[in-house]
Regions:
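Glycine-rich, proline-tolerant flexible connector loops at the mouths of alpha/beta enzymes
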Residues: 1-9, 92-99
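Glycine-rich, small/polar surface segments that engage phosphate groups of diverse ligands
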Residues: 26, 31-37, 41-57, 63-67
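Short, catalytically relevant binding-site loops at active-site mouths
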Residues: 5, 34-35, 51, 73-75, ...
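Small/polar loops that bind or transfer phosphate-bearing groups
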Residues: 1, 48, 68, 122-123, ...
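Alpha-helix-loop-beta-strand connector modules within alpha/beta enzyme cores
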Residues: 10-28, 56-71, 101-128, 161-167
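Glycine-rich phosphate-binding active-site loops on the catalytic face of alpha/beta enzymes
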Residues: 48-58, 89-100, 128-164
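Catalytic cores of alpha/beta
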Residues: 27-42, 71-84, 115-121, 126-144, ...
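Glycine/Thr-rich beta-alpha phosphate-binding loop at enzyme active sites
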Residues: 39-41, 46, 65-114
Length: 167
């Protein structure tokens, strides 16, 4: 979706927003604060090189969710101390094809579980074959991209992953 033109992104975001509303699912837009505002998304997720969370909060208001990607204990603690950050992304845990970033490994995940009283999502290279290690370290939320969209059956893969969390 990052390579699509803005009009197409807005159109798709509106369609996704409606699907989410109908199904009671929170809709977070990645990177694009303007699109999140246009489609009345529930929030926006930003990276370390994107707009600062304080500036995002000024734009989207107090009732929207702000997520921030973090890649180190220092970034995690800074996000934890910022009242404008509602949750963080912790990762990439493992090597991933969706980002050109050095994996942080399970150590940062363990740190987040023990030291950051802030909701977080473990992300990066998480697959069905390694998700048990993520769960064992205490992660309660995960983000998987290629494992799901590349699956022969997205619904079967999602169900399989959900079962691992329900054990």
């Amino acid at each position: 979706a990052k390579t699509k033109d803005t009009r197409e992104k807005v159109k798709e975001a509106r369609e996704i927003r409606e699907l989410c509303r109908k199904n009671g699912v929170i809709f977070i837009v990645n990177d694009n604060v303007d699109i999140a505002l246009l489609v009345d998304a529930d929030g926006v997720h930003i990276g370390q090189e994107d707009m600062h969370p304080d500036d995002v909060r000024k734009l989207i208001g107090d009732n929207k969710i702000i997520g921030l990607s973090t890649h180190s204990e220092k970034q995690g603690m800074e996000a934890y101390k910022n009242p404008n950050v509602d949750y963080i992304g912790v990762g990439p845990i493992f090597p991933t094809t969706t980002k050109d970033t050095t994996p942080v490994g399970l150590g940062y995940l363990e740190y987040a579980v023990k030291n950051l009283d802030l909701p977080f999502v473990a992300i990066g290279g998480i697959k069905a074959h390694n998700i048990d290690a993520i769960i064992a370290k205490g992660a309660q939320r995960v983000c998987l991209v290629s494992e799901i969209v590349g699956a022969d059956s997205i619904s079967d893969m999602a169900r399989n992953l959900q079962e691992k969390f329900n054990k």
